[in-house]
Amino acid sequence: MALNNTYEARLVQQETAVGAGVQILLLALLGSAIGMGPAGWLTGLAFAMATWAVLSRALHRTRPRSFGPANRVTLGRAILVGGVTALVADSFESSPPVSLLVGLTAVALILDGVDGKVARHTGTSTALGARFDMEVDAFLILVLSVYVSTQQGPWVLLIGAMRYAFVAAARFAPWLNAPLPPSMARKTVAAMQGICLLLAGADLLPYLGNLAVVLLALGSLVWSFGRDVVWLWRNSRKATPAVAQVAPEQRGEARAAEVRLTVRADVRAGTRAEEREMLELAVR
C-alpha cells in the first residue's frame, strides 16, 4: 500500500513537471513568432517555475491520489496565463501583438467555466482544485490590469490588486476569513472583470468607450467586495455577543466542577482521619 501511494504521488508530481515543460514550450513558440525580448522570457520562466513550485508543494501537503481532469484543465489555463504574462512583460519593451494577446486571454477565460463543470461532472471537486482555479483567475486579472493601465492609467491596477489586498487584510482582521454565502452576483462580477479588461485591452472601442468599460469593472468590483466585507463584519459582530454570553456559563460550570472535586477530596480526607482514630483506639 505504501509503495502504491508513493507511485501515485510521483505520477501527480510528474504532471506538474509536464505542465512546466509545456509552459516553456509555449514561451519558445511565442519567442520565435514575435521575437520576444529578455523581459518576456524572464517573466514567463519565472511564472512557470513559481507555478510548478507552489503547485508541487500544495500537492505534497494534500497528497491526492490523482491530479484529476479538472486540475488538468486549470493547469492548461495557467499555461495560457503564463503566455499572457510574458506578452504583457514584453509589451514594455516593444509593441505587443494584440491579436495574439487577446487570443490567449480569450481561451483562458473560456476555459474558466470548463474546469468547474468537469470537476462536478467527474466528482473530483477538491479544495485544492478550487483554490488553484481561484489563484489562476486572480493572477490573470492582475496581469490584464497591468496591461490596460498602460493605456488608461495606474488606477486600473486597483482591479487586479483588490483581491490580494483583501487577502492581506484578512491577516490582520481574521473575521474576513469567515466563509461567505453563495452569491450569483459575486460570480457575475468576477466573470465581468476578465471580459471588461480583455475588451479594453483589445482596443476595439474609442478611448472613452474603453474608459467606461474599465470603470464599470472597477465599480462593480468595489461594490461586490464592499458588500462582502460589510456582511462579514456584521456576522462577526453577531457572533461576539453569543460568545460573551456562553463564556460566563462555561466559567461557572468549571468553577462548580472545581468545588465538587474539592468537597469530595475533603470528605475523603475526613473519612481517612476517622478511620485512623478508630484504629488507634482499637490498638489501645
Which functions belong to the PLM regions below?
Residues 100-103, 107, 128, 132, ...:
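Hydrophobic alpha-helical segments and helix-packing faces
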Residues 261-262, 266, 270-274:
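Intrinsically disordered, low-complexity tandem-repeat regions
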Residues 84, 117, 128-131, 145, ...:
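Broad hydrophobic/π-residue packing in well-ordered secondary structure
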Residues 121-128, 150, 176-177:
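Juxtamembrane helix-boundary/capping and inter-helix hinge elements in multi-pass membrane proteins
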Residues 1-71, 134-260, 275-284:
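A feature for the membrane-embedded catalytic helix bundles of lipid/isoprenoid biosynthetic enzymes
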Residues 41-55, 72, 78-126, 208-222:
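Membrane-embedded alpha-helical segments that form the functional core of polytopic membrane enzymes
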Residues 79, 110-118, 131, 135, ...:
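Active-site His/Glu-centered metal-binding helix of metallohydrolases
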